């Protein structure tokens, strides 16, 4: 299985840099295992889903993890300073691990100033990341980060424009509750309160799980034999309540449809445990590619993914590689918008396939 098997040509003009407004007005490509595609809108989920279907939603909350600061050091010529860009990754036992640009010019013990209220000391510098210890913690840190930080937009958007105040709303789901992600669960960005209410009225049910999406979601696959790729790890949790709801839906023969690849990866991680699906908490590095046996997933709502990405491999595993090529060819021909701020799809494989 080669990396090139998951490649395709995407016109640059189809990469979305802003979301649809309102967010639920984005387009929705509905694709079953065979047969014609349906070109709909996200609001049409009310018609496409059935009473009793259960959507599994990721309630992680994106933190403003991108920081721009100034490092200061003394030199033979006197005090010197330089600009530094930091992307927080995850809390460490003390401080935070982070990506830094330029990494090689940072020295352990140096201070980086981000604002009057927020500064950090470089506690460790590794080969590809640093550990920073900030001058404040807890609520004080959250408040200072909210003031100084920017939303960590994906590289393909950040290359075109800087994050702004609008992204604070746009790059956050309406049901975000648990802080810790440095990337949004983007399929869920399409939901607004009106759509959630309409789906409830239709008889669609919801379960909330948490997977803190990490920056590793944007890392490229660097091996040709994709089966040798080492997946990044992310923390997730399925509560007792969510597990019970999902199990009850399955027991009744109804559909479990995760919204987004993060929710899918989390519930399939739990389903692969020796005792079967149930409450779960921990770090998952599950890698889903063609040949994977889905145990709990009956469908998936997901945006359109990058060529040669692990997420292209995931949707190929769900629908079959040939069917996904047909779906993506249709999406490109019909000028669907791609990636995090783009349009969405509802993928419905044969049940039990």
Swiss-Prot record:
Pathway: tRNA modification; tRNA-queuosine biosynthesis. It catalyses: 7-aminomethyl-7-carbaguanosine(34) in tRNA + S-adenosyl-L-methionine = epoxyqueuosine(34) in tRNA + adenine + L-methionine + 2 H(+). Its EC number is 2.4.99.17. One of its GO terms (biological process) is queuosine biosynthetic process. GO terms for cellular component: cytoplasm. GO terms for molecular function: S-adenosylmethionine:tRNA ribosyltransferase-isomerase activity. InterPro entries: QueA, QueA_dom1, QueA_dom2, QueA_sf. Transfers and isomerizes the ribose moiety from AdoMet to the 7-aminomethyl group of 7-deazaguanine (preQ1-tRNA) to give epoxyqueuosine (oQ-tRNA). PANTHER family: S-ADENOSYLMETHIONINE:TRNA RIBOSYLTRANSFERASE-ISOMERASE. Monomer. This is S-adenosylmethionine:tRNA ribosyltransferase-isomerase. It comes from Dinoroseobacter shibae (strain DSM 16493 / NCIMB 14021 / DFL 12).
